[in-house]
C-alpha cells in the first residue's frame, strides 16, 4: 500500500511496529502526512493556500522523537533531512547558514529521483549493455558505411547471448570502451559561503565532459558499468531536476533536532544574541521563502517542519514568539517505563534481541531469551536511568552490549551451542555494574 493513500490509523499501525507508546505524537504526524494527500485533492487556487501545520515534539532524550520522524519519512518515501539546530549560526557569524538545510534536502531529492529513474530504464539499459558486450565477444559484420550491422543474430551470437544470460561468460576478459567519469572538483570555501562553493562546482562540472576510453575487464564487471552508462544516457537531466525540486517543495520533511538549545534563557547572557539570530533566520524558511540551489530555486511554503527538543533548561515559550507561532501543533512525549523497555526489546519489528540473535547466528551461536531475562534487562536499564542520566531507550544498547560482551568476543568457542539468557544469566553478567552507582555511571 502506498503511504500517500494510507489513513492516519494505518500510518499509526505501521509506526507501532518500530516505536512503543507515544500515541499522541504518532497521531499528530499521521494526520500531517494524510493532510498532504488531502491537499492534493483540493482544486487550485485554494490548494496553494493550504500550508502544512508544523509540529513541535517535546520530550526527554531516547523516547522516540527522532525515530518517529525517520520512520515517517521512510513510510512516505519523501525527501527527508535531520539536522541539529545547534549546527547553524546567524548570518554574518562563522558557521553554516540555515539555507544549507534546503540545499542538502534538494541534493537528497536529486539522488532519490535519480535512483527511481535508473530503475525505470534499467531493462532497456540491460538490453543495450548486452548488445555492446556481444559486439566485443562476437563482432558483427560491418556494412558499406563501416557501421556494425547486427540484423538477425547469427548462430554464434545467439549462443553467446544464451551463455551471457546464464552467467557462463562472467569470467571472460573483453576490451570495451567505457566513459571515464569526470573527477569531482572539491571547492574549499570559508564557513557561511556554501552557495559560492555550489556555483563553482557547477561551473567546473560544465567545463568537463565524459571521455570514452578502451579498457580491458571481465564481462561481469563490464556489464555493470555499461548498464549504469546506458541508463544515464536515457535519463533527461532537466526533467530529473524538475521532478526532484517538485518533490522537495510538495513532500519534503525537515526534522529540526535540539531546537531547545537555541531557545534564549532569561537568566543567561551574551550567547543569546546568536541563538536568537538563528531563530530569526529559521523564520522565513518555516514560513515560506525561496532558496537558491545549484539545481534551481526551491520554495519552502509546503515543506513540513518537525522540531524537537528536551526543554530541560528552557521552555517552548523561551523561543521567540514568531517562531512559536510557526509550530502550531505541540506534542509532549512521555518518559518510558520498565514495561515499555520490555516491549521495545521483544515486540518491535527490528528489536535489539532479533538484531543480536541474527549477528551471533552468523557464528552458529543461538540465543534463547527467556521472558524473565528480558524483564530483568528492562528493570536494570530503567534503574540505571533513574539513578544516573536518563537517556531513555538508548540505555538498552549499552546494557545489551555489556550483557553479550564476553559472548561476542569468544563467539567461535560457543559455535553450535544455544545460550539461554534468563534472569540468572543477566544478574551474573550485569548485577555488579548495575548495583554500583559509580560503575553504572561509567560502564552502563
From Swiss-Prot:
Keywords of the record = ATP-binding, Chaperone, Cytoplasm, Nucleotide-binding
Record GO terms (molecular function): ATP binding; ATP hydrolysis activity; peptidase activity; proteasome-activating activity
Keyword Ligase part of the UniProt annotation: no
Subcellular localization is given as: Cytoplasm
Superkingdom of the source species: Bacteria
> Which Gene3D superfamilies does the record associate with it?
1.10.8.60, DNA helicase RuvA subunit, C-terminal domain, P-loop containing nucleotide triphosphate hydrolases
| Pfam families, per the entry | AAA (PF00004), AAA_2 (PF07724)
SMART domains, alphabetically? AAA, ClpB_D2-small
Q: Which residues form a coiled coil?
A: none
Q: What is its main location?
A: cytoplasm
> A single GO CC term, please?
HslUV protease complex
Keyword presence, Lipid biosynthesis: no
The residues the record assigns to binding ATP are: 20, 62-67, 257, 322, 394
Q: Where is this region: Disordered?
A: 137-162
Q: Name one GO biological process term.
A: proteolysis involved in protein catabolic process
Q: Which HAMAP family match?
A: HslU
Similarity-based family: Belongs to the ClpX chaperone family. HslU subfamily.
Describe its function.
ATPase subunit of a proteasome-like degradation complex; this subunit has chaperone activity. The binding of ATP and its subsequent hydrolysis by HslU are essential for unfolding of protein substrates subsequently hydrolyzed by HslV. HslU recognizes the N-terminal part of its protein substrates and unfolds these before they are guided to HslV for hydrolysis.
- PANTHER family, alphabetically? ATP-DEPENDENT CLP PROTEASE ATP-BINDING SUBUNIT CLPX-LIKE, MITOCHONDRIAL-RELATED (PTHR48102), ATP-DEPENDENT PROTEASE ATPASE SUBUNIT HSLU (PTHR48102:SF3)
Q: How does it assemble?
A: A double ring-shaped homohexamer of HslV is capped on each side by a ring-shaped HslU homohexamer. The assembly of the HslU/HslV complex is dependent on binding of ATP.
Q: What is this protein called?
A: ATP-dependent protease ATPase subunit HslU
Amino acid at each position: 500500500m502506498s503511504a500517500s493513500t494510507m489513513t492516519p490509523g494505518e500510518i499509526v499501525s505501521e509506526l507501532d511496529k518500530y516505536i512503543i507508546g507515544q500515541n499522541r505524537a504518532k497521531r499528530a504526524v499521521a494526520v500531517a502526512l494524510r493532510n498532504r494527500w488531502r491537499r492534493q485533492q483540493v482544486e487550485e487556487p485554494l490548494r496553494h493556500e493550504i500550508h502544512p501545520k508544523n509540529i513541535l515534539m517535546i520530550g526527554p532524550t531516547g523516547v522516540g522523537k527522532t525515530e518517529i520522524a525517520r520512520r515517517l519519512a521512510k513510510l512516505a518515501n519523501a525527501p527527508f533531512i535531520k539536522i541539529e539546530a545547534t549546527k547553524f549560526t546567524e548570518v554574518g557569524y562563522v558557521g553554516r547558514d540555515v539555507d544549507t538545510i534546503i540545499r542538502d534536502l534538494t541534493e537528497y531529492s536529486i539522488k532519490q529521483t535519480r535512483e527511481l529513474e535508473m530503475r525505470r530504464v534499467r531493462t532497456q539499459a540491460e538490453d543495450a549493455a548486452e548488445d555492446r558486450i556481444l559486439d566485443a565477444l562476437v563482432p558483427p559484420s560491418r556494412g558499406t558505411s563501416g557501421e556494425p550491422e547486427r540484423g538477425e543474430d547469427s548462430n554464434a551470437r545467439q549462443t553467446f547471448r544464451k551463455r551471457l544470460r546464464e552467467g557462463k561468460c562472467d569470467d571472460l576478459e573483453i576490451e570495451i570502451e567505457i566513459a571515464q567519469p569526470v573527477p569531482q572538483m572539491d571547492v574549499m570555501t570559508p564557513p557561511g559561503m556554501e552557495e559560492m562553493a555550489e556555483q563553482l562546482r557547477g561551473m567546473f562540472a560544465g567545463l568537463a565532459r565524459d571521455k570514452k576510453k578502451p579498457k580491458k575487464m571481465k564481462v561481469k564487471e563490464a556489464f555493470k558499468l555499461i548498464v549504469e552508462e546506458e541508463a544515464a544516457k536515457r535519463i533527461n537531466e532537466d526533467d530529473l531536476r524538475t521532478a526532484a525540486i517538485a518533490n522537495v517543495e510538495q513532500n519534503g520533511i525537515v526534522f529540526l533536532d535540539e531546537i531547545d538549545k537555541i531557545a534564549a534563557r532569561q537568566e543567561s547572557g551574551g550567547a543569546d544574541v546568536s541563538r536568537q539570530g538563528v531563530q530569526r533566520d529559521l523564520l522565513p524558511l518555516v514560513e515560506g521563502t525561496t532558496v537558491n540551489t545549484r539545481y534551481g530555486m526551491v520554495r519552502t511554503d509546503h515543506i513540513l517542519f518537525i522540531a524537537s527538543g528536551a526543554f530541560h533548561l528552557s521552555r517552548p515559550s523561551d523561543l521567540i514568539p514568531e517562531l512559536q507561532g510557526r509550530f502550531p501543533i505541540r506534542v509532549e512525549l512521555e518518559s518510558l517505563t520498565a514495561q515499555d523497555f520490555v516491549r521495545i526489546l521483544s515486540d518491535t519489528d527490528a528489536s535489539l534481541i532479533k538484531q543480536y540473535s541474527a549477528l551471533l547466528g552468523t557464528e552458529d551461536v543461538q540465543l534463547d531469551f527467556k521472558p524473565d531475562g528480558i524483564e530483568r534487562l528492562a528493570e536494570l536499564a530503567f534503574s540505571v536511568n533513574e539513578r544516573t542520566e536518563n537517556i531513555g531507550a538508548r540505555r538498552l544498547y549499552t546494557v545489551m552490549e555489556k550483557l553479550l560482551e564476553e559472548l561476542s568476543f569468544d563467539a567461535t568457542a560457543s559455535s553450535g551451542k544455544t545460550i539461554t539468557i534468563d534472569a540468572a544469566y543477566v544478574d551474573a553478567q550485569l548485577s555488579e555494574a548495575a548495583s554500583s552507582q559509580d560503575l553504572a555511571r561509567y560502564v552502563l
